[in-house]
């Protein structure tokens, strides 16, 4: 069992039950999944960029990503329907907790001029989205082997009913929010 999962079951559930006056353990918000997405507009001209992105994401998450394709054609971007334009990974259960642990304790502190993450990126239902400008913050990525700096989106999906509950849950997991 992942370290954060154990911490959640032993310490966070009683804490959240006390803070939000839940009567039942099943009411307590929990992590459902983490979606890591990398959109690559440059993949239209150069397919090799997509291959390196898939390899990097597999190393970061520990799971093979799926290649996302364009839903419809856009002439202005020289994009045709079905062209590969990115990759995504959905993490659940132990892999999700392991990834969150590495993100909070290792990767985010490696961001340059890091002052904490914004508390305003919740969607209204307790889910949090975070943008990372470069994949180099992850220690698994070898600096010498990357061909291009790519950003990625990380969405943390919770069962929380409100942003306040979601923020309290993520704070207990150690997410470094700005004030």
From Swiss-Prot:
Coiled-coil segments: none
Keyword rRNA-binding attributed: yes
A Pfam family annotated for this UniProt entry: Ribosomal_L5
GO biological process: translation
Entry's Gene Ontology cellular component terms: ribonucleoprotein complex; ribosome
Keywords linked to the UniProt accession: Ribonucleoprotein, Ribosomal protein, RNA-binding, rRNA-binding, tRNA-binding
Gene Ontology MF term list: rRNA binding; structural constituent of ribosome; tRNA binding
Gene3D superfamilies hit by this protein: 3.30.1440.10
UniProt function note: This is one of the proteins that bind and probably mediate the attachment of the 5S RNA into the large ribosomal subunit, where it forms part of the central protuberance. In the 70S ribosome it contacts protein S13 of the 30S subunit (bridge B1b), connecting the 2 subunits; this bridge is implicated in subunit movement. Contacts the P site tRNA; the 5S rRNA and some of its associated proteins might help stabilize positioning of ribosome-bound tRNAs.
Family: Belongs to the universal ribosomal protein uL5 family.
Subunit structure: Part of the 50S ribosomal subunit; part of the 5S rRNA/L5/L18/L25 subcomplex. Contacts the 5S rRNA and the P site tRNA. Forms a bridge to the 30S subunit in the 70S ribosome.
Protein name: Large ribosomal subunit protein uL5
Phylogenetic placement of the source organism: Bacteria, Pseudomonadati, Thermodesulfobacteriota, Desulfuromonadia, Geobacterales
